[in-house]
Amino acid sequence: MKLKRLGSIFLAAAMMTAALTGCGGGDSKSDGDSASSGGKSTVTLWATGSDNVRSIFEKLTEDFNTNSEYKDQYQVELQFMLSGTGAQGLADMVAAAGKAGQTNTDYDIVDWSGDDLAKIMSKIGEDSFVKLDKSKIPNAATVEAESTVAPEYAQPYRGTTVILAYDSEKVPNPPKTMDELVEWMKANPGRFAYNAPGTGGAGDSFARTSVYNFLPDEAITSGDEKWVGQWDEGFEFLKSIHPYMYKSGGSIVYPNKNQGTLDLLNQGEIDMCPNWADMVLSQRAQGAIKDTIKITQIDPSLSGSLQTLTIPTFGSNEEGAYAFMNYMLSEQAQQILVNDMAAIPLIDTSSMDMTGYEDLQGLDVSNFRILSIGDLGTQFNERWDNEIGSIG
């Protein structure tokens, strides 16, 4: 039987038990466990992330359970793990269950970021997941975005990407390429900033793509140590643009966190910065930042990612998992994702209300650069700290 549900956030004791047993939190089910008290079949959804992700999943599962075409057949239960808690990660838990040969668990459907998807596939392989039958996901028919990892086993349902955020009153014609951006920096010294890598994904993306623009395409999704020796040209580029970065008190400053650069942009201290599209648009919709702040992509693009869903072979409700996967690609669910987190929709938006989020329609998810360099990221940040952040 399943352990009693403890809500969307695990208690520390439960997490410790999972870590000690090495089998994660996906308990084996008896035949009666897949049916809820209302006679509907239970589907357990596993996800991880920050609190805003938890909030959106709570809203989506409630909508699925009460308003979707599947409301009389299935009941989704959310098991959510807050990131950064120091507890055993979701990928490690799912991997432990797979390696232990567990069957009929409550790992029915799992949500993954790009990095975590690569991690779980490296741990237990594609064979641990159901090869997706697209006839059971009819809403995926118009989705052009495809995962770069295990594309036959992972279904993308939303996108996010780092873009250039700019004040359209100050920059009526934003740069379209990296070369144009550099020329703009030189013509407008001190009006551009990116947050220090390691303090937020936008700064990570800008610094890493700036370096990896000088490397072969295969390098951006590789953790092979051989690429470290080819970082020199990219780091020289970062040094070359350093003098044109934002200054405070007469010294170059790399702000802390994604919000740090966005605050500077909103306060008029800078005119442009890299940031997450969803972060900028959601804050603009809430009135937290000026409505003159807009977004644009450059070529080569900054990095983005696709959020995906997979169905482990050792779950216990494959058909229910397909139902939820199909729901997530419905206009109904995609509208919630747009309204509540400014997620980039992956379906045709012509019938959706994009008021306030029109900028999302101009983002081409098919051209997203997924940058996943594994443990090299730590080395990268250390080198940036030593060679760029310390220049002053």
Residue ranges and their predicted role:
Residues 84-128, 137-151, 279-286:
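Pocket-flanking alpha-helical
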Residues 50-55, 114-260:
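Extracytoplasmic ligand-binding site segments that recognize negatively charged/polar headgroups
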Residues 141, 160-162, 235-241, 289-310:
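Periplasmic-binding protein-like
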Residues 1-44, 392:
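Short, low-complexity disordered leader/linker segments with a strong preference
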Residues 38-118:
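Early extracytoplasmic/lumenal segment of secretory-pathway proteins
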Residues 263, 366-392:
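Conserved C-terminal helix/tail region of periplasmic/extracytoplasmic solute-binding proteins
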Residues 253-284:
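Oxyanion-binding "anion nests"
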Residues 302-371:
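Mature extracytoplasmic/periplasmic domains
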